[in-house]
From Swiss-Prot:
Residues recorded as bearing Phosphothreonine in the entry: 45
TM stretches of this protein: 103-123, 167-187, 202-222, 258-278, 314-334, 382-402
Subunit structure: Associates with the mitochondrial contact site and cristae organizing system (MICOS) complex. May associate with the endoplasmic reticulum membrane protein complex (EMC).
Native organism taxonomy: Eukaryota, Metazoa, Chordata, Craniata, Vertebrata
Record localization: Mitochondrion outer membrane
Protein name: Mitochondrial outer membrane protein SLC25A46
Family of this protein: Belongs to the mitochondrial carrier (TC 2.A.29) family.
Entries under Pfam families matching the protein: Mito_carr
Gene giving rise to this polypeptide: Slc25a46
Residue positions, PTM Phosphoserine: 32, 35
Chief location: mitochondrion
Residue ranges of Solcar repeats: 96-187, 311-413
Signal sequence range: none
Keyword check for Mitochondrion: yes
Keyword Acetylation: no
Length: 418
């Protein structure tokens, strides 16, 4: 139920004000919002698509009517490029290509995270909730084999089911966070100064957001694991309907083993908050390392304009990739427990991940999170928490490949334009 990437590329960072980064020896000026007469207090600036408009390190998109000062890599205005001397400045056509290519890089990353990776998410969730399975699919080879079987017996729709509901859950999560922060003093972002009170309020906002999105996440989970063989042609808003019905106790009848929503609050919020914290920390560390590495390379030798443009875009994407990978791997056992608790008692029929051409019912009787953990450990062993882990390997291998291909295409375009 968390977004596939943390909000913003500053992790727990603060976008406003002036930030001093010792790695670059100078302040980075954030975007200016203008005077209160130009923009109302209710207007907020949406986050930039990664790599779309940030032309240099630390530079954010300028607001309407406010000119932006050209940033420098060092404090001296006479030496915009490290090592002395002035590098070639891109012309208007080069700048347009720079913006267009950066926007394309961001869209390619978002497309990979939310569309191309969806079959891996479907298989991963089906393996996690299948307590009958004898094959755990810990490697990508067995996952590819079962993907082929599902596609052969049920068609391509078997691997793309529930994709619309995942976008709805992300929209509900972002919308709930914005509304709650608008009507409460809880901050959506925190400053770089470690203020325990501000961090606590920010995490409280995350907890409330995950609580609001929880019933819709549960409905989306059912759509992604329900077998296509017995699945009805549901509309794209079925996730919203089922989520509201879960809250008010209406909709599709469930069994007596269905866990009440209040018993799902703790594991759901715990998973969401831990995923956000781990992602933010990893992202911050990786981005800092890449910034220092880039800065040292600029000091050692003069770099080309093409390399400067690549250094402006890809560190954020790489940091986001590493953050998502680490958080998914670390929290995979907790995610398995969470999905089994959400799916219990919903009368869901899933595909047989051992054979690929049969269906199985979900008839678990967990009493809660602790009972679920103990039962998995006793009946399926420690590796039972990692069922379907091969899908994670395929998902992030595909993501890394798309990033590398995008970087190669972008480098070729820049070489032809310079």
């Amino acid at each position: 139920m968390h977004p596939r990437r943390p909000e913003g590329f500053d992790g727990l960072g603060y976008r406003g004000g002036v930030r001093d980064d010792p790695a670059f020896g100078g302040p980075f000026h954030a975007r200016s919002f203008g005077s209160g007469t130009e923009l109302g207090h209710w207007v907020t600036t949406p986050p930039d698509i990664p790599g779309s408009r940030n032309l240099h390190w630390g530079e954010k998109s300028p607001s309407y009517g406010v000119p932006s000062a050209p940033p420098t890599l060092e404090g001296s205005a006479e030496e915009p490029f490290p090592g002395g001397g002035e590098g070639p400045r891109p012309g208007p056509s080069s700048e347009q290509l720079n913006r267009f290519a950066g926007f394309g890089i961001g869209l390619a990353s978002l497309f990979t995270e939310n569309v191309l990776a969806h079959p891996c998410i479907v298989l991963r969730r089906q393996c996690q909730v299948n307590y009958h399975a004898r094959h755990y699919h810990l490697t990508p080879f067995s996952i590819i084999n079962i993907m082929y079987s599902f596609n052969k017996t049920q068609g391509p729709r078997a691997l793309w089911k529930g994709m619309g509901s995942t976008f709805i859950v992300q929209g509900v999560t972002l919308g709930a966070e914005g509304i709650i922060s608008e009507f409460t003093p809880l901050p959506r972002e925190v400053s770089h100064k470690l203020n325990p009170k501000q961090i606590g309020e920010h995490l409280l906002l995350k907890c409330l957001t995950y609580m609001v999105a929880m019933p819709f996440y549960s409905a989306s989970l059912i759509e992604t694991v329900q077998s296509e063989i017995i699945r009805d042609n549901t509309g794209i808003l079925e996730c919203v309907k089922e989520g509201i019905g879960r809250v008010i106790g209406l909709g599709v009848p469930h069994s007596k083993r269905l866990l009440p929503l209040f018993s799902l609050i703790f594991p759901t919020v715990l998973h969401g908050v831990l995923h956000y914290i781990i992602s933010s920390i990893i992202q911050k560390i990786v981005l800092l390392i890449l910034k220092r590495k880039t800065y040292n390379s600029h000091l050692a030798e003069s770099t080309s304009p093409m390399q400067n443009m690549l250094d402006a875009y890809f560190p954020e994407l790489i940091a986001n990739f590493a953050a998502s990978l680490c958080s998914d791997v670390i929290l995979y056992p907790l995610e398995t427990v969470l999905h089994r608790l959400h799916i219990q008692g919903t009368r869901t029929i899933i595909d047989n991940t051992d054979l690929g051409y049969e269906v199985l019912p979900i008839n678990t009787q967990y009493e809660g999170m602790r009972d679920c953990i103990n039962t998995i450990k006793q009946e399926e062993g420690v590796f039972g928490f990692y069922k379907g882990f091969g899908a994670v390997i395929i998902q992030y291998t595909l993501h890394a490949t798309i990033l590398q291909i995008t970087k190669m295409i972008y480098s070729t375009l820049l070489q032809n334009s310079i």
